[in-house]
């Protein structure tokens, strides 16, 4: 489902076709998804 098509916490997020999973956000200067 849509929930699985996302980047888990700790994944690189810049230049990816997916967005960070729910309750995470892309920290651009660290280039990774972090929990919010």
Curated annotation (Swiss-Prot):
InterPro entries: Assassin_bug_toxin-like (IPR012325). It comes from Isyndus obscurus. One of its GO terms (molecular function) is calcium channel inhibitor activity. Belongs to the venom Ptu1-like knottin family. This is Toxin Iob1. Keywords: Calcium channel impairing toxin, Disulfide bond, Ion channel impairing toxin, Knottin, Neurotoxin, Secreted, Toxin, Voltage-gated calcium channel impairing toxin. It comes from the Eukaryota. Disulfide bonds join 6-21, 13-26, 20-33. Binds reversibly and blocks N-type voltage-gated calcium channels (Cav). GO terms for cellular component: extracellular region. It is found in: Secreted. The presence of a 'disulfide through disulfide knot' structurally defines this protein as a knottin. Its main location: secreted.
């Amino acid at each position: 489902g849509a929930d699985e098509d996302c980047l888990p916490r700790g994944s690189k997020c810049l230049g990816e076709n997916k967005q960070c999973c729910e309750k995470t956000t892309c920290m651009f200067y660290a280039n990774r998804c972090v929990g919010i």
